[in-house]
Amino acid sequence: MTFETISVTLEEGKTLVFETGKIARQANGAVLARMQETWVFSSVCAANLEEAVDFLPLRVDYQEKFSSIGKTLGGFIKREGRPTEREILTSRLIDRSMRPSLPNRLMQDIQILSYVWSYDGVTLPDPIAICGVSAALAISDIPQTSIVAGVRVGFVNNRWVVNPTKAEMDVSRMELVLAGTENAILMIEGHCDFFTEEQVIEAIEFGHKHIVTICKALKDWQKHIGKEKNTSGIVSLPEEVQSAVNTFVEGKFVDLLKIKEKKAFEAASKQLENEVIEQLQEENEVFTAFNIKIAFKQAKSNFIRGLIREQGLRSDGRSVTTIRPISIDTSFLPRTHGSCLFTRGETQTMAVCTLGSEAMAQRYEDLNGEGLAKFYLQYFFPPFSVGEVGRIGSPGRREIGHGKLAEKALSHTLPDPMKFPYTIRIESNITESNGSSSMASVCGGCLALMDAGVPIKTPIAGIAMGLILEDDHVTILSDISGLEDHLGDMDFKVAGNTEGITAFQMDIKVEGITPDIMRAALAQAKEGRQDILETMKQALAAPKTDLSQYAPRIETMQIKPNKIATVIGPGGKQIRQIIEEAGVQIDINDSGLVSISASSPQAIEKAKSIIEGLVGEVEVGKIYEGRVTSVVPFGAFVEILPGKEGLCHISEFSKQRIDNVGDFVKQGDTLTVKLLSINEKGQYKLSHKATLSE
């Protein structure tokens, strides 16, 4: 294979370059994509499956090599291993972008690997990875229904920016990653600072304009160097099987849909499926159990979609705009800082808020350096939530993704950390699941924050929207169930308050989703969100004014950066002494912001007093509570601040004459003194007598 390259310019200084033919020539497709000095290598490979499956076995792994920034991992193990949260989230972005572009019944095991080989700290690598993977698929022999591209959109200085730099993203009011084809959007993921629905649509349209440019370039490249597509792995369902199944189940889905409870519905559906297989299965390659199972799923899908399209009725009896019944129990757990049991239909979460000091913050390390997350939401999805037996251990990709979406939704309503200096952890423990559990996490998490007394700016709620698209007939569904998510054409999650949006995520299974459809979905989502917020308001109208008695108390104070070493002391001796003496936890950042946490206000005040003494500057005319360090015939030496000692002469002890200072004070006594002056040698002249008349 010869070396080939193509470039696409999005904006001035932002040119995407794709190369192939030099690296990984044995892969089905391999591309090195680069912008500036950020280079991402991507490969795609396919293998035939030994037996048929009813899903697309697509595996995506994205990895950021620390060598790309000239570093190695810290710690004992220097080899990249378990993926970071950022790598998992980017892998999901690539998967969700590519999966809709692959044929439904492609019976091949497909693996996508994407590596960041060079990172300049300016150009963010994830949209480059999406485009690089799409390019590798386009020129490979793996069948693809359409060419995909992806971009990031930011909002900087009141204008939209495509593939913003890291510095631009640091000040952007929106982060949107979207992927699509020349004609449609397939995936969006983002969060923003209470943007309107129309602003979100505007951002999507802006991003799609650049996606079209990339797709056209990759399409031309594919025509020029692409391999012939191998369609032998695409297996079609014999028409006679689908026809026979349709005939057998005719009229039986009506009775099935009378069952409203999820587990009972699934059991009855499985029983009917087994009956169909038992009646129609034959000893040939056509009427196999697998083909009949696929045909049954298609028949069930067609019936439920038709019911929605023609009658506006859903499988659980709701109208297209009806939200499932909601129940809310705040302060559900007695010893937590804040909690809420949030139930919407058959989806339920036990949301818990925990407050702590900076020591509780989540530490992380990626290509942009080390950091601290003082707010994080962790989503747990145990197998019992869907009545199954399963693995318990480290979180899966789905748990990471759902947790991050809910976290972003709530992050925009948090108070100023200078006014509320707590680290905040939200747990969303899913105890029942039948669709929209990530949006239940937003609602439950918000109520847990309010129950904990976190002074949020405004309540936030989330809702998942669905879509049934048949030819030109569009039906939008509010608050979709798990079945509707599976059988529908769109999963569009939207979170925000009554006025604006804070987070959104959309996955599309079909082409043809226009801006007008998204606009209608967002408008319907706003109505549903407002209804949910009203229900939440009835349960808890505003954040509690007091923190839980079990939550730590935290206060901050500012010291000069050049005084940090004084507070810490040699080898940390001084700060350890303060922590032990006052019974507190202390965190100090590089700017000199000191965070003090303790179980009581008295302990905090004691620590603040000690620190103020350490960093304070003496003032002439100020009165101090000093400690007598030594007594001499002509007076006493008194420490007025740590390390700052002066002489109180015998004549300055009393208005009456005294002959022996030892009769008046002893070493270790506390003595109130006034600083009268500081001489040219920096020595302090103190007076106890001067405080007696004041």
Swiss-Prot record:
Function as written in the Swiss-Prot or TrEMBL entry: Involved in mRNA degradation. Catalyzes the phosphorolysis of single-stranded polyribonucleotides processively in the 3'- to 5'-direction.
Subcellular location(s) of the protein: Cytoplasm
Reaction(s) catalysed (UniProt annotation): RNA(n+1) + phosphate = RNA(n) + a ribonucleoside 5'-diphosphate
Enzyme class: transferase
InterPro entries reported in the protein's UniProt record: ExoRNase_PH_dom1, ExoRNase_PH_dom2, ExoRNase_PH_dom2_sf, KH_dom, KH_dom_type_1, KH_dom_type_1_sf, NA-bd_OB-fold, PNPase
Pfam families linked: KH_1 (PF00013), PNPase (PF03726), RNase_PH (PF01138), RNase_PH_C (PF03725), S1 (PF00575)
Gene that specifies this protein: pnp
GO biological process, any: mRNA catabolic process
Family: Belongs to the polyribonucleotide nucleotidyltransferase family.
Primary localization class, coarse: cytoplasm
GO molecular function: 3'-5'-RNA exonuclease activity; magnesium ion binding; polyribonucleotide nucleotidyltransferase activity; RNA binding
SMART domains (alphabetical): KH, S1
Domain KH: 552-611
Claim: Transferase is one of the keywords in the record: yes
Ranges in a coiled coil: none
EC assignment: 2.7.7.8
Required cofactor(s): Mg(2+)
Keyword Metal-binding: yes
Residue stretches making up the S1 motif domain: 621-689
Lineage summary: Bacteria, Pseudomonadati, Chlamydiota, Chlamydiia, Chlamydiales
Binding residue positions for Mg(2+): D485, D491
Name of the protein: Polyribonucleotide nucleotidyltransferase
Source organism of the structure: Chlamydia abortus (strain DSM 27085 / S26/3) (Chlamydophila abortus)
Domain of life (superkingdom): Bacteria
